[in-house]
């Protein structure tokens, strides 16, 4: 019932001509347009782990051994012999071309056929194969392989699907990306935080009533199941809602973001306020961001020129025009208006997450002994 009501509500907002007129000026601003050739991956190195994969490949890339390994597995394929786990793992690390990957895929099919009812243990071959496709730029082969009925169950992990979707997004193969998402749900693979972000990014890029409906449906489904929707996913949903002339939904999505202090969130907030006509609030946000006493090493809030141009246009001829122009001039002088587009802010490759360095085992033991002695001393006192 909820999804049915959502479908009806979506059709209403998309066909409401009077509401669309309110946003016409904002859409003409060319906001959210991706610059030509600006293709981005959305997953961080922590997820893709390409560097780690390449380091492991280096230990296997010895030409005289590579040919030998491929000869062995080809002979096993011809004789219908069982492929061992170690052989498949070594083979995947030995692939250097598209032709090698095709052979590896055939070996995977044989391996999966022999081990369909056997658990692979902790090691997952799916992400390894997808990282190989990622490295060699074989996104279409990756998509075809992960949807192959003969390999159902082999790619049982979320990471394999996420890496595939990320590759397809980078090559602007958005419809193929949605097909992979459909296969993911069909196989019962759970959607992770990264999956929601990737799917909403694809829906945002497609910007159609169908993609908007998919975004709304998955968002409702995720919230109903108690999934954690990441901030970046909400930002893509907000951008798509604005492109679909749905200010009400954009505001609702924004209200779900717990921490809105990022540059992207602040730009989206000003954009929403400008389209809404809330000039007083928009000016307050910009005025608050204009902090001349900010230390040199602290990065000042920046706003996209696309966003401030929408604000200028919306305030033109009104009582707030002069005040808007005044605060924008001050921001311009402070270097807080940037040429970076909203699409650039949305579609970026995140940096690797910082991890605290772990102490060696010996140091940890010393710290534990020190802590115990301190506790004993306190008890004696």
Curated annotation (Swiss-Prot):
Chief location category: mitochondrion
Alphabetically ordered keywords of this record: Mitochondrion, mRNA processing
Record-linked InterPro entries: mS27/PTCD2, Pentatricopeptide_rpt, PTCD2, TPR-like_helical_dom_sf
Name listed for the protein in its UniProt record: Pentatricopeptide repeat-containing protein 2, mitochondrial
Family: Belongs to the PTCD2 family.
Superkingdom of the organism of origin: Eukaryota
Keyword Lipid biosynthesis in annotation: no
Gene Ontology CC: mitochondrion
Role noted for this protein: Involved in mitochondrial RNA maturation and mitochondrial respiratory chain function.
PPR repeats by residue range: 157-191
Keyword Mitochondrion attributed: yes
Subcellular location(s) per record: Mitochondrion
Gene (UniProt): ptcd2
GO BP terms: mitochondrion organization; mRNA processing; regulation of mRNA processing
Matches recorded under Gene3D superfamilies: Tetratricopeptide repeat domain
